[in-house]
Regions:
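Feature marking well-ordered beta-strand scaffolds used for ligand recognition
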Residues: 1-176
Length: 176
């Protein structure tokens, strides 16, 4: 097939998610930003080649991780230089025109997260877009944060679960 080079410097860390036939790529390389690559162009490849990203969003520098909520068309980027490393909200409904629409900084660095449209028994949150984040300040303050991110310009903290002195809140995935 070929390769898509890094946007800046080499880094062993990349995270890639796919949405609407596009790969969304972040890296911890300085100033990498978000690369967007249209995967449909791979259908006609006959010889290996070097590809170029279709779009590069440079608003946030580097990032550790990305999650895409396919139901809402939003990407959530974690560990950037914006919002103290908290989640950054990017509208990717048009994959070739991503737009930063907000973020959340109140609870320090978010290492990873999962975002869902809530469909549980609590009617207050039914149909709302909810972020579950694994947060750490790099020391003893580790927590899981639960944020209503339905309104990107006004995220609202619902709750948190504190994991002080217990290691690192690295990642968490819902089971149902």
């Amino acid at each position: 097939m070929g390769k898509l080079p890094t946007a800046t410097l080499k880094s062993p860390w990349r995270d890639i998610k796919v949405y609407q036939n596009h790969a969304f790529i972040v890296s911890e390389a300085p100033d990498h930003g978000l690369q967007v690559f249209d995967l449909t162009q791979l259908r006609l490849v006959k010889e290996p080649q070097t590809f170029v990203a279709d779009v590069r969003l440079t608003d946030f520098g580097n990032a550790h991780n990305i999650w895409i909520n396919e139901e809402s068309g939003y990407a959530y980027v974690f560990g950037t230089k914006l919002y103290e490393g908290g989640p950054l909200f990017i509208n990717v409904n048009d994959p070739l025109d991503p737009k930063v629409e907000g973020g959340y900084s109140a609870d320090s660095y978010t290492h990873d997260g999962q975002i869902v449209i809530y469909d549980g028994p609590d009617l207050v949150f039914k149909g709302r877009e909810i972020l579950f984040g694994s947060n750490s300040d790099g020391g003893e303050d580790n927590q899981i944060i639960i944020i209503d991110v339905t309104e990107k310009s006004r995220p609202v903290k619902i709750s948190d679960i504190n994991y002080s002195f217990s290691g690192y809140a690295h990642q968490g995935i819902l089971t149902e």
